Curated annotation (Swiss-Prot):
It comes from Debaryomyces hansenii (strain ATCC 36239 / CBS 767 / BCRC 21394 / JCM 1990 / NBRC 0083 / IGC 2968). CoA binds at residues 274-278, 389, 393. Presumably involved in regulating the intracellular acetyl-CoA pool for fatty acid and cholesterol synthesis and fatty acid oxidation. This is Acetyl-CoA hydrolase. InterPro entries: AcetylCoA_hyd_C, AcetylCoA_hyd_C_sf, ActCoA_hydro, ActCoA_hydro_N, NagB/RpiA_transferase-like.
């Protein structure tokens, strides 16, 4: 037992349950239902999952030792290793990484995505364990950075669905990460209370705290304490580029316009932002803008938010995860006293709560796969079928925020077309967010304000303002043709030609380009 482990584990009876990761392997059997802590690649267990993968590889148990795995969102590289070893029978609700995406799209792993605000509560309802006799997860493996005097768990850089998983787990294994500094005091934990006893959330500001800083645990459920000395491994963030900066500039001009007209306050409303180079560009733009005293209510914070804090423009941020690179975490730890006063990590049912999002009037900003001319957005399935990562929390925010923004390049790079694949299409091949959820669509070409517009008005606005010039005439032609035929059949509300609606996608699959010679082309 290391001295730092003894210092971190302040509940003495747990020290009698010390095990190595290898000693825990015997506890796991094929077909079990497992919960892991973690969210967006940080705060997940590491040494126990790796020990199980070692066991599978050494004994050629690929496909013979598999599990139903539930994580708040994505975990770290450990779940990718599980996917490579055919150890994931079922996975939910969100994932990131080529190995697991391959397992899902080749049919080896059954995957279902779910709104991240709903997933933890549905887990406590027994919806995902209803095939089991006791409705419980067999094991939850949770990473802690400290354990309090009463046995409660202090998470690390992610809370996610850990409170709910612990509440519905038969047995619990705690990995105490001693290479990561203790995050004690940074969290605000809400334990699940199911209907009809659930009460309204009291949060009225982004810095409101209920007061619980660790996750309560029934000590009798804890079967092992394992020391971990493995840091989170987050790949470098995609830097902003000219396209993403143009998107950010278009959006910031809109914010300035709305503030000038009094539809937004001078410090805006609490901001929600996703991950990626567009999100980075927006954060960078806000840090350099005239907007001050800003606040954030979001799912995940990345490295750019540290610079946002340092700019003096950001007062406080709430999230369920801090997804930082190694350099980002080093910077965070070095300035702990500064950042910890301006930051709160919450359960994902709180960070993504539609009730709180609507009350605070957040501004939601997310990136889709594609948006169609009537403002339906596809966030998950390329060409309607190939799963990327999952829905995540985008719809939690987009349906409930005061302003719901979809930002996307007008076209994405393609190996077979110099313009790329159009992100504005006649008809989305899969719909995650409907036309009723989006207020703004913004690309590097411009911004379409859709508030209060009819479908045909939205279509003209989206095509004219946001589509790539190389696709604009083609999309306009589709809308004109659809309107012509719809007028004949008296169905002009939202005109479509079903036999043409996916021709851009079909042409890309057959010919490597979304550019059509003619809409009369047959497939």
């Amino acid at each position: 037992m290391s001295s730092i482990l003894k210092q971190r584990v302040r509940y003495a009876p747990y020290l009698q349950k010390l095990r190595t990761a290898e000693q825990c392997v015997e506890l796991f059997k094929h077909g079990q239902y497992l919960g892991w802590s973690g969210f967006t690649g940080v705060g997940a267990p590491k040494v126990v999952p790796d020990a199980i993968a070692d066991h599978v590889e050494k004994n050629n148990l690929q496909g013979k030792l598999g599990f139903n795995l539930f994580v708040g969102a994505s975990a770290g590289p450990e779940e990718g290793r599980w996917a490579e070893n055919d150890m994931l029978l079922r996975r939910s609700p969100h994932q990131v990484g080529k190995p697991i995406a391959k397992a899902i799209n080749t049919g080896k792993t059954k995957f279902f995505d779910k709104h991240l605000s709903m997933f933890p509560q549905d887990l406590t309802y027994g919806f995902y364990t209803r095939e089991k006799e006791n409705d419980l997860l067999d094991y939850t493996i949770i990473e802690a950075t400290a354990i309090t005097e009463d046995g409660s768990i202090v998470p690390g850089p992610a809370v996610g669905a850990s409170p709910e998983m612990i509440s519905v787990s038969d047995k619990i294994i705690i990995e105490v990460n001693t290479v990561t500094p203790s995050f004690e005091g940074l969290h605000d934990i809400d334990m699940p209370v199911n209907p009809p006893f659930r009460q309204p959330y009291p949060h009225t500001t982004v810095d409101y705290r209920t007061g619980l800083t660790a996750i309560p645990v029934d000590p009798s459920k804890v079967v092992a304490i394992v020391e971990s000395q493995t840091r989170d491994k987050v790949p470098p963030n995609t830097p902003s580029d000219e396209t993403s900066r143009n998107i950010a500039n278009n959006l910031l001009e809109f914010f300035e316009h709305e503030a000038k007209l009094g539809r937004l306050p001078e410090n805006l409303h609490p901001l929600q932002s996703g991950i990626g180079n567009i999100a980075n560009a927006v954060v960078e733009g806000l840090a350099d803008s005239k907007f001050k005293n800003l606040t954030v209510w979001t799912e995940v914070l990345q490295d750019s938010f540290l610079d946002f804090f340092e700019s003096g423009s950001l007062d406080f941020a709430t999230a369920t995860s801090i997804r930082l690179t190694e350099a980002g975490f080093d910077k965070f730890y070095e300035n702990w006293d500064t950042y910890s006063k301006k930051l709160c990590l919450r359960s994902q049912v709180v960070s993504n709560s539609p009730e709180i999002i609507r009350r605070l009037g957040t501004i939601a900003m997310n990136t889709p796969v594609e948006v169609d001319i009537y403002a339906h957005a596809n966030s998950t399935n390329v060409m309607g079928s190939r799963m990327l990562n999952g829905l995540g929390g985008s719809a939690d925010f987009l349906r409930n925020s005061k302003l719901s923004v979809m930002h996307t390049p007008s076209a994405r790079p393609s190996k077979t077309d110099k313009t790329g694949v159009s992100c504005i299409v006649p008809f989305a091949t899969h719909v995650d967010q409907t036309e009723h959820d989006l207020d703004i669509v913004v690309t590097d070409q411009g911004l379409a304000d859709l508030r209060g517009l009819s479908p045909k008005e939205r279509a003209r606005e989206i095509i004219t303002k946001t589509s790539h010039p190389d696709y604009r005439d083609q999309l306009t032609d589709y809308l004109d043709r659809a309107t012509f035929y719809a007028e004949k059949s008296k169905c002009l509300h939202e005109p479509h030609i079903l036999q043409d609606a996916f021709k851009m996608h079909l042409n890309f699959q057959e010919n490597g380009t979304m550019k059509l010679d003619s809409w009369d082309k047959k497939f």
